[in-house]
Amino acid sequence: MTPFMTEDFLLDTEFARRLYHDYAKDQPIFDYHCHLPPQQIAEDYRFKNLYDIWLKGDHYKWRAMRTNGVAERLCTGDASDREKFDAWAATVPHTIGNPLYHWTHLELRRPFGITGKLLSPSTADEIWNECNELLAQDNFSARGIMQQMNVKMVGTTDDPIDSLEHHAEIAKDGSFTIKVLPSWRPDKAFNIEQATFNDYMAKLGEVSDTDIRRFADLQTALTKRLDHFAAHGCKVSDHALDVVMFAEANEAELDSILARRLAGETLSEHEVAQFKTAVLVFLGAEYARRGWVQQYHIGALRNNNLRQFKLLGPDVGFDSINDRPMAEELSKLLSKQNEENLLPKTILYCLNPRDNEVLGTMSGNFQGEGMPGKMQFGSGWWFNDQKDGMERQMTQLAQLGLLSRFVGMLTDSRSFLSYTRHEYFRRILCQMIGRWVEAGEAPADINLLGEMVKNICFNNARDYFAIELN
């Protein structure tokens, strides 16, 4: 019987152990997509307690707690921090088999140093007190944890109207060497069907000093904000393409669509597709000219529980996987961006694992001369960010593309404790390659495979995003 979560956790061959301990373990972290609040990094936020750093805002944990019958007041409601933590501690023993069980104990181990102890009601007091004592120390502040975890770069997720003042404050502090750069997330600027669109256009017009009436005005406003983001070091965009649409339109049609929407009219699905296509093609060309990377996160079915959405708002754990076809529309969109050789470096993520092979083969259609891995099939995302999901994504990437050119893992997280997801990924990567070697499916060449592992863990992302590190 193998003990739980030793130093060789998941490393079930000797070759995997060598790969992890000698090549993967000590690689820095290049976390190119996350949802950390830049204000907390700028202020070097000190966490009040374990709930504050670990459970607050974590919809993964809330989903598990609800499934365990926990009352909503103990998830997102007015219960005390300690009551919410105790509810989580009571849920954890029921999460065996869920990635939350592994994540929980990896996060207790690093950075808190808690080993050989499982979170449960019987250990809740001890773990709560031990972690809170550590959180009072200087090296457990927001910046302190990032430094402990050997982070070199993080890309936050930011709206085009954001001032980026916190990024500027961080950049001016020469004592803090981790790059904290904004990522451009313009969903509100092209989700024309949303009820909030008109209000957003007014805000975008205000910050860009542009009166948005025609499509060209929107392009002008977005270009000004792209320049603002570029001035703060941005090299990455991110798009939530819950549904992939494609329909072409001329400028007069786009002007009419925008004008009628700003006048309060409801648009047809075809008109929505025309508008979204035009914005994405325009933005893709801007990214290509600037050398940015675009990310497409495809296939979420959001806000399914309307009663809870009205009570609690979005992003609180009521989203799931969509099953709408997207191959043909995505192909047309990428091909349109590529017509004038203005398709930027692109990472494609799917939420439905059924679409893994779709994206794995789609990325091969648009690779770029002289640019290894220009089109990336991205890491297992959200519900696929677990052992089976990561294994499937990497296996299919290896079979349909080049695993050796993969830009690797990202946290996609709102928590400063989520950096151990990079460790989890690295262990799974080394386990997978070690098994290939054990089965005679890959050569037992530690130098060849060790360099490949180092590249996937850090070097490929550093080179792909072309961000100068400190």
Curated annotation (Swiss-Prot):
One of its GO terms (biological process) is D-galacturonate catabolic process. InterPro entries: Metal_Hydrolase (IPR032466), Uronate_isomerase (IPR003766). Keywords: Isomerase. Gene3D superfamilies: Metal-dependent hydrolases (3.20.20.140), uronate isomerase, domain 2, chain A (1.10.2020.10). Pathway: Carbohydrate metabolism; pentose and glucuronate interconversion. Its EC number is 5.3.1.12. Pfam families: UxaC. One of its GO terms (molecular function) is glucuronate isomerase activity. It catalyses: D-glucuronate = D-fructuronate; aldehydo-D-galacturonate = keto-D-tagaturonate. Belongs to the metallo-dependent hydrolases superfamily. Uronate isomerase family. NCBIfam families: PRK02925.1. HAMAP family: UxaC (MF_00675). This is Uronate isomerase. It comes from Escherichia coli O157:H7. The gene is uxaC.
